[in-house]
C-alpha cells in the first residue's frame, strides 16, 4: 500500500521539480491520486485506521469525500432547463469548490510535520550587499517592508540595531519580531534579495543590479541552550551615531563575544547599558541556537529544495525588477507584477510567502513518505 503511494508521489514530485510551480495539494489530493487513495484506504480500514490515531485527519478526509460527492450532484443541475435552479446550482458549486480547497489545505497541514521552531518568535537581520549606496537604499526599503508586514500580521516589532548610511540608506539593521507563527512565515525570507532599477543619480538611464541579505534567526520563548559565562567577553563603549547629548557621554553600547565560536553580538539602540546588554544577549542566544538548528536541519532535511532560514544565503532567492514592475521568487518560479504594492508588506507579500509554504509542505510530505518506505 505504501509503495504505491510512494511511487505515485515521486512521479508527481519529478514533474514538480522540473516545473517548480504550485499548488501541490491539488495534485496530491486529486481523486485517484496517490495520497487520496492512501487516505481512503486508511479511513475505510477497521484495524489501524486513521480514526484510532488521527481523528481530526479522518474527519477531514471523510468530509472532503462528502463535499466532492455533493459537488458532482450539484453540477448535474447545470443542465436543467429551469434558469433559477441553474443560478442556484452555480452558487452552490462555487461554495463547494471553496470548501473543497480549504479541506485539502487542512489535510495537508495535518499531514505535514511541523518544524521545531515554527511557533517561535525571531530575530530579523538585514544587511546591504553588492551595489554601494543603491544596495543600502534597497536595504532600508526592505527593512521598512518587513516592519509593515509585521503590522499587517499584528506581530510585535522591536528594532534592536539600526546603522544608516550617510546618504540615507541602511548598512545593517536587526529587529525582534514576535507573534503567532511568526517564524513559520518569515523563515522563507532568509537569503539574498536582488534589486534591478535605475538609480536616481544615474544620468544615462542604465539599470543597476544590487543585493541585500536577509537572515531569519528563530527566537523561541525558552531557548534550551546553556552558555557558560566564562565563554563570554563583554565590552562596553560609547554609543555612536544619532542621539544628541547621549552620544559619546556614557558607555551604553554593549559588545558580547562568544569565544568558542567567535560570534559577536552588539547593541547600542537603548540609552541604558543594562537594556543593551539584555538585547545583545538575546541576539547572541538566537545566533547560537540558529547555528545548532542549522546543523540539525542539514542532517534531517538534506534533500529539501526550498531554502529555509539562513541556509544557502549565497543563492539569490528573489529579484525585484522595478523597470518591469515585477518581483520573481526563483525558488518556485513565481512572478507578481505590482512591485509597488508588494513593497507595502501586506497582501501580496503574504501571498508569496503562502506559495512558498505550499511548496515546502509538498516537499516535506514527499520526504516524510520516503523515510517510511
UniProtKB/Swiss-Prot annotation:
Its main location: mitochondrion. GO terms for molecular function: translation release factor activity; translation release factor activity, codon specific. PROSITE patterns: RF_PROK_I. The keyword Transit peptide applies. The modification N5-methylglutamine is found at residue 245. It is found in: Mitochondrion. GO terms for cellular component: mitochondrion. PANTHER family: LD18447P, PEPTIDE CHAIN RELEASE FACTOR 1-LIKE, MITOCHONDRIAL. This is Peptide chain release factor 1-like, mitochondrial. The lineage of its organism: Eukaryota, Metazoa, Chordata, Craniata, Vertebrata. The gene is Mtrf1l.
Amino acid at each position: 500500500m505504501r509503495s504505491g503511494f510512494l511511487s505515485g508521489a515521486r512521479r508527481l514530485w519529478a514533474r514538480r521539480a522540473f516545473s517548480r510551480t504550485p499548488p501541490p495539494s491539488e495534485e496530491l489530493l486529486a481523486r485517484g491520486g496517490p495520497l487520496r487513495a492512501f487516505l481512503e484506504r486508511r479511513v475505510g480500514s477497521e484495524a489501524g485506521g486513521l480514526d484510532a490515531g488521527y481523528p481530526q485527519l479522518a474527519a477531514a478526509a471523510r468530509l472532503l469525500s462528502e463535499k466532492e460527492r455533493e459537488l458532482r450532484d450539484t453540477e448535474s443541475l447545470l443542465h436543467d432547463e429551469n434558469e433559477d435552479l441553474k443560478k442556484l446550482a452555480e452558487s452552490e458549486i462555487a461554495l463547494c469548490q471553496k470548501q473543497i480547497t480549504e479541506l485539502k489545505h487542512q489535510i495537508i497541514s495535518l499531514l505535514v510535520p511541523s518544524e521545531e521552531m515554527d511557533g517561535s518568535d525571531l530575530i530579523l537581520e538585514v544587511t546591504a550587499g553588492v551595489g554601494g549606496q543603491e544596495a543600502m537604499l534597497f536595504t532600508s526599503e526592505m527593512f521598512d517592508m518587513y516592519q509593515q508586514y509585521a503590522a499587517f500580521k499584528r506581530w510585535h516589532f522591536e528594532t534592536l540595531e539600526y546603522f544608516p548610511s550617510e546618504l540615507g540608506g541602511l548598512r545593517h539593521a536587526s529587529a525582534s519580531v514576535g507573534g503567532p507563527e511568526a517564524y513559520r512565515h518569515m523563515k522563507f525570507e532568509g537569503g539574498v534579495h536582488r534589486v534591478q532599477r535605475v538609480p536616481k543619480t544615474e544620468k544615462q538611464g542604465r539599470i543597476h543590479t544590487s543585493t541585500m541579505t536577509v537572515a531569519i534567526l528563530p527566537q523561541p520563548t525558552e531557548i534550551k541552550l546553556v552558555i557558560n559565562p566564562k565563554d563570554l567577553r563583554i565590552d562596553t563603549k560609547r554609543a555612536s551615531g544619532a542621539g544628541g547629548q547621549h552620544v559619546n557621554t556614557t558607555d551604553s553600547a554593549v559588545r558580547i563575544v562568544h569565544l568558542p565560536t567567535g560570534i559577536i553580538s552588539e547593541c547600542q539602540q537603548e540609552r541604558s547599558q543594562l537594556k543593551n546588554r539584555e538585547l545583545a544577549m538575546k541576539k547572541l542566544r538566537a545566533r547560537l541556537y540558529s547555528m545548532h538548528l542549522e546543523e540539525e536541519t542539514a542532517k534531517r532535511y538534506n534533500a529539501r529544495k526550498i531554502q529555509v532560514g539562513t541556509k544557502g544565503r549565497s543563492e539569490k532567492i528573489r529579484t525585484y525588477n522595478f523597470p518591469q514592475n515585477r518581483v520573481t521568487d526563483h525558488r518556485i518560479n513565481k512572478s507578481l507584477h505590482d512591485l509597488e504594492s508588494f513593497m507595502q508588506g501586506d497582501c501580496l507579500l503574504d501571498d508569496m510567502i503562502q506559495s512558498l509554504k505550499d511548496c515546502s509542505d509538498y516537499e516535506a510530505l514527499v520526504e516524510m513518505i520516503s523515510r517510511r518506505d
